[in-house]
Amino acid sequence: MTDTILNGLTETHCHILPGIDDGSKDVETSLKMIAKLSAQGAEKIVCTPHYYSDSISLADFLQKRDAAAAKLKAALPPGSPEIRLGAEVYISKYLFSNDDLSPIKIEGTNCALIEHSFSEEFSDRACNRLIDLICDHGITPILAHIERYKSLMDKPDKLDYLISLGCIAQVNICLLYTSPSPRDYAA
């Protein structure tokens, strides 16, 4: 990562921006979520709303994300954790129709939180898309909630391969305390 985003406790995957995806429905809910994260010691929060390139253009997504972030930042009380913008990007062929993918990176870094289909295996094609992000766009993929990908959990060599390419694996904290449930593998 290109800065000190990981210094201190950082929440790198949350749906906290109001009204943009399946996370917080409004600013009040977002502020409650931030208060809980702050009480747990979070110093930085990376807002990662879902971006599906087959459903919305990158420009329209960024406009929605930035508007939601502006609302949230205007309501933040003093002493709140630092807010950074990012996205949870569903990787598909449509993503690469954008010439410039730098806006999907976590603010201040070369990393992007990447989501893959839960029902598909990490095929050679999927690996090649990750390689394209790394080699052609200078983006370090952070593979979101890897515990939900049965194909990676069943084939640790595949995960090792992705990490050897330069990918970073992100897990939800519940994995540290419980075994993945069938819901984690849901399509």
Regions picked out by a protein language model, each given a short descriptive name:
Residues 21, 51-53, 118-120, 147-150, ...:
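Short histidine/acidic/glycine/proline-rich micro-motifs that form metal-
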Residues 58-169:
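Extended substrate/RNA-proximal surfaces in nucleic-acid metabolism proteins
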Residues 177-187:
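Single conserved hydrophobic/aromatic residue that forms the stacking wall/gate
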Residues 16-20, 114-115, 170-175:
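Short, basic, glycine/proline-bearing loop/turn elements
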Residues 23, 92, 121, 185-186:
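A broad, structure-centric signal for solvent-exposed, well-ordered loop/edge residues
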Residues 18, 49, 146, 180-182:
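Proline-centered helix-kink/hinge sites
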Residues 1-80:
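An N-terminally biased module of ancient metal coordination in phosphate/nucleic-acid-related enzymes
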Residues 10-12, 46-48, 86, 142-144, ...:
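Active-site neighborhood of phospho(di)ester-bond hydrolases with catalytic His/Asp-centered motifs
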